[in-house]
Structure formats: C-alpha cells, structure tokens
Swiss-Prot record:
One of its GO terms (biological process) is nicotinamide nucleotide metabolic process. SUPFAM superfamilies: Ribokinase-like. GO terms for molecular function: ADP-dependent NAD(P)H-hydrate dehydratase activity; ATP binding; NAD(P)HX epimerase activity. Disulfide bonds: none annotated. Residues 4-276 form the YjeF C-terminal domain. Its cofactor is Mg(2+). This is ADP-dependent (S)-NAD(P)H-hydrate dehydratase. It comes from Streptococcus thermophilus. Its EC number is 4.2.1.136. The lineage of its organism: Bacteria, Bacillati, Bacillota, Bacilli, Lactobacillales. It is an enzyme of class 4 (lyase).
Amino acid sequence: MKVDDDLVRQVIRPRLRGSHKGSYGRVLLVGGLYPYGGAIIMAAIACVNSGAGLVTVATDRENIIALHAHLPEAMAFDLRETERFLDKLRAADVILIGSGLGEEETADWALELVLANIRSNQNLVVDGSALNLLAKKNQSSLPKCHLILTPHQKEWERLSGLAISEQSVSNTQRALEEFQSGTILVAKSHKTAVYQGAEVTHLEVGGPYQATGGMGDTLAGMVAGFLAQFASTDSYKAVIVATWLHSAIADNIAENAYVVLPTRISKAIPSWMKKLSL
C-alpha cells in the first residue's frame, strides 16, 4: 500500500457537525511507572492532540499532578486501583499499554490484568516495555482482540526471535504469522514499515533527528488516537496514516531544527490534520 493523498483522506476526514466527544472514541493508556513518568505523559499528549474523544491514563499516583500540569484534558487514576482499572478497561475502545511501564512486578500485573479482561472488539496497542514482557509469554495464549504491536528492532528481536540482521520483509511476515490473524505490526527503524498479514507498507519519511527519548511514546499515542477517532476506517490504514503523519511532521520541523522533540510533533498534529482533511 502506498501513502498518498487519497489514502490520507480516506482516514483523516472532516468532522460531522452533530458529533460529540463520544463519537471519537475512548482510550485507556497504561504506563508511566517510576522513574518513567514522562513517557505516558507524552503518549497522552499525542493521543489527545490526535483527536481521541476521551483519554484516561492509568499511572503512578505521584505522576498524576505532572500529567495534569501538562494535559488537563486527560483523566487519570492510580494504576493500582484494581476496580477502577477494570471499569476503565471495559469502557475503552482502545487500550495502549507500555509507555514507561517498566518491567517490575506491578508492570507485569498490569499487563496480565489487561490481557485477562480485554474483549474481542477492543484494540490493544502494545508498546515499549510491555513488548518485552509480552515476549516472555506464550503468544498462542494471547486474547482475541485487535492487536497492534509497535516495536523497534531490538524489541521485535525479543518478540519474534529474529536477530536485527534477519529482519527482512519475508522473515518478518513469517514471524507475524505466530500472532493472531489480523495483528498489525509497526516495525520501527530508519526504514519504518507497517505490516498486516501479506500486506506491507514502507514509509519514506523520518530521519535521525527523531532519535530522542519519547519519540516512540508519541507515535504510540498517535496510533491509539487514530484507532479511537477513526473507528469506522480500516485499522491498517489508520495505523499507516498515523505513523506516516508522525514522521512527516518531524521532517517539516527538522527543516529548521537539528533535533525534533516529540512534544513539538504533538503540538503540530491538529493543524496538520485540519490541512489534510480539506
């Protein structure tokens, strides 16, 4: 599949006058355990700016003040509140887990809670340290849901067993067959590609100016936001366009910046989406 104006406009469409926040999906983001609180904040900022209707963050209680200082638009609660966690999980259209989650006992507990309770009609975006935790589990026992994986090359090595030097298109497609049918893979690298089954889309955007902390968290937040907001669109197309837009904005910023900060990408998302929807 090629990223062109037609594909972008299939995904990013003008909003209907009679729509409301409930029309644009509910997202639950899980992560930001000490000392990685900033990661989930950046993911949430990207998710809100991408247009998700209602965004809730499950994180360390100590991280909530910082989150609301940067993003009062998001709701937040202590990740360890099990009943609230389950309520928000059941209500979500999209769950993003892994941004700043870490790999300690609480992180694994949170991932297990999500895997045990997610429903088949929900989207699960797995990013960051949750990918490493997932790599230690039996892939055949994963729940039936709409699964989206967003690993960089080393994380994909742990998940797939493919060394970085072996991560060709054909090998990656074969490895993806070990996951449930329909799984979407965003294989992040200097030549990012998005896979689903036999489909693969290579992106011709992005560069080394994106090599900074929080870049992947921001992408994961955008992917979650697009899946929530554009639920009537083919998920594969929505993920492709979110991933493309993330790096297209970075390319534009890099014309006048040596390094592109993830938060600058997030600030630019609404204006870019407005322009692309016309």
